[in-house]
Design a protein with these regions (language model features):
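PP2C/PPM-type serine/threonine phosphatase catalytic core
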Residues: 2-321
Length: 321
């Protein structure tokens, strides 16, 4: 499963050894038609409200600016989940995520994260905005960033505050998501989990948080007007030096099996199990005491006219197509 995210304003109509799947296209743009201005606080929702939320796509299909698609592979159940949520708290904000489950209940974990994570992100942002109302701190509605202190935008402080706000929201929502999975009464996440690659496009700003080995790749034009691929994420594999150091410090083990030497895995200190092929994931609580974490990598990027689209994809697309 993958996603192709347009960075323009124009509208457009797992498995560690996962099987190849067709690459879907998911275009995100900003519709030019006039719509009612809405702010972040207008979009606070609960899980019970999700089925009635407009501009939220999570199955094969399309909306006014996007289309998404996933297909069953050759092995077992399709454990991928995906979401595009246009007008996410504001008319020019779009949330997009791809989640690749693994383990016996990975498909359920991925779907749970798909539904709950954006709501948690929304809740943290709304809470932060509520605290800022009436103060001279930065507030924003959609693409505009405003402050009661006029000099802030001269030295970039407004952008810094916006970046800090989104970073905090991503970190807190990922932490809350993993905590909910751990205490869920009907979902066994002990040896099951999910990756996550999530992006928020707010005007020309791109905010991204991710765990696991699902990727974000941007298509951008170089000086010769040729399209080049720019990988925006790092595959958080167990053999990355910083990841391996943390895991070993927590008494976990990292090694590859003889019959697949190219796939490093995380193992318990006292047993050759479960063999997780990533260093960060939601769930997988059997390994959380041994170095596997759910803290996301966060990044911010200012999009330019050269940036054309972004592909979000699970490992079935990245490694096998």
């Amino acid at each position: 499963m993958g996603a192709c995210v347009s960075t323009s304003r124009s509208t457009c109509s797992s498995k560690s050894n996962g099987e190849p799947v067709p690459l879907p296209c998911l275009g995100i743009g900003l519709c030019r038609q006039k719509r009612t201005k809405r702010t972040f606080s207008d979009h606070v929702v609960t899980l019970q409200h999700l089925p009635s939320i407009p501009n939220r796509v999570f199955t094969n299909g399309k909306s006014r600016t996007s289309c998404i698609f996933t297909q069953q592979g050759r092995k077992g159940i399709n454990q991928d989940a995906m979401i595009v949520w246009e007008d996410f708290m504001s008319e020019d904000v779009t949330f997009c995520g791809v989640f690749d489950g693994h383990g016996p209940h990975g498909h359920l974990v991925a779907r749970k994260v798909r539904d709950a994570l954006p709501v948690k992100l929304q809740s943290f942002l709304n809470s932060c905005q509520s605290r800022q109302n009436g103060s001279d701190q930065t507030c924003f509605k959609g693409n505009s960033m405003k402050s009661d202190v006029g000099d802030l935008d001269k030295d970039g402080s407004i952008e810094d505050k916006l970046n800090s706000l989104w970073r905090e929201a991503f970190l807190k929502s990922y932490k809350a998501m993993d905590k909910e999975l751990k205490s869920h009464p009907n979902l066994d996440c002990f040896c099951s989990g999910s990756t996550a690659i999530t992006i928020v496009k707010q005007g020309s700003n791109l905010f991204m948080g991710y765990i696991g080995d699902s990727r974000a790749i941007m298509g951008s034009k170089d000086n010769n007007d040729s399209m080049v691929a720019v990988q925006l994420t790092v595959d958080l594999k167990p053999d990355l030096p910083r990841e391996a150091e943390r895991i070993k410090r927590c008494k976990g083990r990292v090694f590859a099996l003889q019959d697949e030497p190219e796939v490093p895995r995380v193992w318990l200190p006292f047993d050759d199990a479960p063999g997780l092929a990533m260093a960060r994931a939601f769930g997988d609580f059997c390994l959380k005491e041994y170095g596997v974490i759910s803290i996301p990598e966060f990044s911010h990027r200012t999009l330019t006219e050269r940036d054309q689209f972004i592909v979000l994809a699970s490992d079935g697309v990245c490694f096998h197509l």
